Amino acid sequence: LSRGLGDVYKRQIKHGAVPRAVPGITVGHEMVGIVEETGRRVTKVKPGDRVTVNVETFCGECFFCKNGFVNNCTDQNGGWALGCRIDGGQAEYVRVPYAEQGLNKIPDSVTDEAALFVGDVLATGFWAARISEIGEEDTVVIIGGGPTGICTLLCVMLKNPEKIILCEVDPK
């Protein structure tokens, strides 16, 4: 199992910025793993498959899911559930609600470490670029040049804005 645990995530939980977080839950929402077993409705993956796990779980049926805002899924297991309300990637085993849309097979040619970027880091950048309605005459500002910021930069570049500004703290 490969997993990441971002500094922002840890600070948000520690300082109460995630009101739906359940005390005592094992954290971790960026993960890659091997399927041990599946529910009866899961057909896209099978035991033994290496998979990425989406950061958001979503029902696919509510208003928000049908309109592409899966992070606001109204189902009790929807939205940011893994590592927040359900044991996450730092646990030995993880139950993934709505696994049919929440797991993606990893090709053999892709390492676990590379695949780890898909579930949250790249997905965040892609989502930001997608919903921002960026036009070719726009200037886009990205705050933070860490892995998520760089993935956001790459996705924003696909929109061809006039200017892209990436802000990062000078470590000196």
Q: Can you say where each PLM-predicted feature lies in the sequence?
A:
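N-terminal Rossmann-fold NAD(P) dinucleotide-binding loop
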Residues: 149-150
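Glycine-rich beta-strand-centered segment in the early N-terminal region that forms part
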Residues: 3, 17-66, 107-109
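Adenosine-nucleotide cofactor-binding segment
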Residues: 139-145, 154-172
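Glycine-rich beta-alpha junction loops
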Residues: 6, 55-58, 69, 99, ...
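NAD(P)H dinucleotide-binding glycine-rich loop of Rossmann-like/cofactor-binding domains
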Residues: 61-143
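Cytochrome P450 core scaffold surrounding the K-helix E-X-X-R motif
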Residues: 10-14
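Single conserved hydrophobic/aromatic residue that forms the stacking wall/gate
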Residues: 1-5, 9
